[in-house]
């Protein structure tokens, strides 16, 4: 556990396990032998409140009965409603769209709302995502990290605009190009890729796969007037694309199956070429 410069707490527990880790989505998987409806599940939940001086990190165990279609999100809500109203965790959409419920599930970052309890039980250990500032228990401030990263990368279209004309039609775009941009825009900023990243766990200024993916998205956009030289000034160092160690934990855990491996390799190749000019 470490302290941030502004007094926040970042908790680093349970490193990502690339090999032999349980599945973290609701894709069809075979449940472990013996996990069936009516069986008791044991949830070992990391508890810690950085705002309470008396609080210390510890695992707290809860038991719930397995029910059909129970996700970890459903289980956590049941724990909070019936067993412990003080338990903190995040959620919004419950459909794998907002990314709020991301956490470390049996050592692997994933979304609670897209993980079936039967796929990771009967013994389930939950912890907050590392790297991000801890709010309490399973709740972390991914928004603060993502905002700082986006502002640093200037993650918006840079357009040499004349006077604003609300009557002018939007510029046309080739449908195939629009689809390529949309593919990268599917990122939900859940933070799973950052938490699975070895570099991000070692240096706080690394932009992670989510940042490199943003650069790849705007580089595709014909409305953005920036050049590779401009992008090199932003990500052409060890805190940017050259900090990636190619462990590809990010690619393994992305709940939206984004082509992170391809985009990281592509952007790094372009930045190497730019740096050699």
For each of these PLM feature ranges, what is it?
Residues 2-33:
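Short, Gly/Pro- and small/polar-rich lid/capping loops
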Residues 58-71:
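Short, contiguous acidic and Ser/Thr-rich linear segments
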Residues 69-85, 124-277:
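Ferredoxin-type iron-sulfur electron-transfer modules in oxidoreductases and energy-metabolism complexes
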């Amino acid at each position: 556990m470490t302290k941030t410069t502004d007094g926040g707490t970042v908790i680093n527990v349970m490193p990502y396990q690339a090999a032999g880790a349980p599945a973290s989505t609701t894709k069809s998987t075979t449940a472990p032998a013996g996990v069936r409806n009516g069986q008791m599940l044991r949830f070992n939940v990391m508890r810690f409140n950085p705002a309470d001086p008396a609080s210390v990190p510890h695992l707290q165990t809860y038991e719930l009965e397995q029910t059909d279609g129970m996700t970890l999100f459903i289980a956590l809500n049941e724990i909070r409603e019936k067993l412990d109203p003080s338990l903190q965790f995040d959620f919004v959409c419950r459909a794998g769209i907002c990314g709020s419920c991301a956490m470390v599930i049996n050592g692997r970052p994933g979304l609670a709302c897209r993980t079936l309890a039967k796929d990771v039980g009967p013994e389930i250990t939950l912890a907050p995502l590392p790297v991000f500032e801890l709010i309490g228990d399973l709740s972390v401030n991914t928004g603060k990290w993502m905002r700082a990263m986006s502002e640093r990368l200037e993650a918006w279209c840079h357009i040499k605009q004349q006077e604003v004309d609300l009557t002018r039609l939007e510029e046309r775009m080739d449908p195939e190009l629009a689809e390529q941009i949309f593919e990268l825009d599917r990122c939900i900023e859940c933070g799973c890729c950052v938490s699975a990243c070895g570099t991000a766990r070692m240096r706080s200024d690394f932009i992670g796969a989510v940042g490199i993916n943003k650069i790849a998205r705007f580089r595709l956009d014909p409305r953005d007037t920036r050049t590779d030289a401009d992008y090199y000034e932003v990500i052409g160092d060890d805190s940017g694309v050259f900090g990636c160690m190619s462990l590809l934990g990010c690619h393994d855990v992305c709940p939206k199956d984004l082509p992170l491996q391809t985009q990281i390799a592509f952007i790094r190749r372009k930045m190497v070429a730019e740096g050699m000019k």
